[in-house]
From Swiss-Prot:
Organism, as annotated: Gallus gallus
Induction: Up-regulated by viral v-myb.
Tissue occurrence: Expressed in a broad spectrum of hematopoietic organs, such as thymus and bursa. Lower levels of expression detected in the kidney.
MI domain location: 161-282, 324-447
Keywords attached to this entry: Cytoplasm, Nucleus, Repeat, RNA-binding
Protein's name according to its UniProt entry: Programmed cell death protein 4
Length: 467
């Protein structure tokens, strides 16, 4: 037993010495013999015991090193070989960090590459579900939920929000002139009891605008009647306008006459009753309201049978024909020659609302100067062009275009007016001195070559101009 215990409890040092002796003996003897050890009556080769000890020691080291320390220091493989820190042993826990497979059988909850399934995914893309049927026996069933129709409720506009919302709409209408667009925008609003205020606001803005704006306002009220507002609303709106005339006069002195024209146009369009004016007889205390009703009465009495009044505001802007504009400008210049009022001539030109056609006035004014025989027309037209140029009513581009038209047609004008070249040169020079035209435009003025006389060669003496 003592012998067996001695064989069993062999220290590590003895095993190593034994291994060294064994291998050294093999080398000396050429490996002819193999030493054996008896354990529990069994003879086991010494090499097997040595390998078992080394493997056990290596496994203990691996178990001792945790996964957090596996990346530091050296490790020993199962074969007893030392591994460097940069190399990862296949059995090391760090090898599982680089493994892309799930560490548990349930996965990480990500959708599959094929499409359907996964956390937060409701089937394949494009999958159609059946309509969920309502269970009447469900404890949470509510019969009031069936056949429900949901719609957006728009609150009615108050007075402040009404003016803030509709003012940009009407001002934009003055630019594009599309009544259908205004009608669609007003239908989207819940006007409530403020419908009658639509014509009131439109007329109030038109009083401060141009004649074309007032014409567009009359057309807008006529088109909105029956779709957005009713005839009762139109009557109510004009009642309010007549009542507010004392305040409107402060901003627009011509408000009574203009409101009277709006009333006459509304009666002519058929959106206001013909007896509307008669209802105010003897009941009007305001001077402004009485003046407005008198103006409407006069306009309606001129027409036959209350026909539609189309020209109550005149035709302004691009609605006018070229022939009509030429006639208006000719009358404007003739009235100016009679009155000499520069401000009135400027106002009449602006009321035409044709800034793109102002070159016609420049052309007609110069032609009148060429056709005139006295200095009065010359001086008055020079003052007119100077005033219009300084006030920027006529732009430099329109002024230049008017002069260029005269330059092109001066040969034809000279057939009727023999001295037109000399008069034109003088007028152009005066305009340049007054700052009306530029130097390049003055230099473009054509000049007719002097006629050569037969006797011009006699001593080089020239004939006088009056010859």
């Amino acid at each position: 037993m003592e012998i067996e215990k001695q064989h069993v409890y062999i220290s590590t040092v003895e095993v190593e010495n034994l291994s060294d002796a064994l291998f050294s003996g093999d080398e000396e003897n050429g490996g002819s013999e193999e030493r054996k050890t008896e354990i529990n009556g069994n003879w086991i080769p010494a090499t097997s015991i040595t390998e078992a000890k080394i493997n056990a020691k290596a496994k203990r080291r691996l178990r001792k090193n945790s996964s957090r320390d596996s990346g530091r220091g050296d490790s020993v493989s199962e074969n007893g070989e030392t591994q460097k820190a940069g190399l990862v042993v296949p059995t090391s826990p760090k090898g599982k960090v680089l493994d892309r497979r799930s560490r548990s059988g349930k996965g990480r909850g990500l959708p599959k590459k094929g499409g359907a399934g996964g956390k937060g995914v409701w089937g394949t893309p494009g999958q159609v579900y059946d309509v969920e049927e309502v269970d009447i026996k469900d404890p949470n069933y509510d019969d009031d939920q069936e056949n429900c129709v949901y719609e957006t409720v728009v609150l009615p506009l108050d007075e402040r929000a009404f003016e803030k919302t509709l003012t940009p709409i009407i001002q934009e209408y003055f630019e594009h002139g599309d009544t259908n667009e205004v009608s669609e925008m007003l239908k989207d609003l819940n006007l409530g009891e403020m419908k009658y205020s639509v014509p009131v606001l439109a007329v109030s803005l038109a009083l401060e605008g141009k004649a074309s704006h007032r014409e567009m306002t009359s057309k807008l009220i006529s088109d909105l009647c029956g779709t957005v507002v009713s005839k009762t609303d139109v009557e109510k709106s004009f009642d309010k306008l007549l009542k507010d005339l004392p305040d409107l006069v402060l901003d627009s002195p011509r408000a009574p006459q203009l409101v009277g024209q709006f009333i006459a146009r509304a009666v002519g369009d058929g959106i206001l009753s013909s007896t509307y004016i008669d209802g105010y007889k003897g009941t009007v205390d305001s001077i402004q309201a009485r003046a407005a009703l008198d103006r409407a009465t006069v306009l309606l009495s001129v027409t036959k049978g209350g026909k539609r009044i189309d020209n109550v505001w005149g035709s302004g802007g691009g609605q006018q024909s070229v022939k009509h504009l030429v006639k208006e400008i000719d009358m404007l210049l003739k009235e100016y020659l009679l009155s000499g009022d520069l401000l009135e001539a400027e106002r009449c030109l602006q009321e035409l609302e044709v800034p793109h056609f102002h070159h016609e006035l420049v052309y007609e004014a110069i032609v009148m100067v060429l056709e005139s025989t006295g200095e009065k027309t010359f001086k008055m037209m020079l003052d007119l062009l100077k005033s219009l140029s300084r006030s920027s009513v006529i732009t430099m581009d329109q002024m230049k275009r008017g002069y260029e038209r005269v330059y092109c047609e001066i040969p034809d004008i000279n057939l009727d007016v023999p001295h037109s070249y000399s008069v034109l040169e003088r007028f152009v020079e005066e305009c340049f001195q007054a700052g009306i035209i530029s130097k390049p435009l003055r230099d473009l003025c054509p000049s007719r070559g002097r006629k050569r006389f037969v006797s011009e060669g006699d001593g080089g003496r020239l004939k006088p101009e009056s010859y």
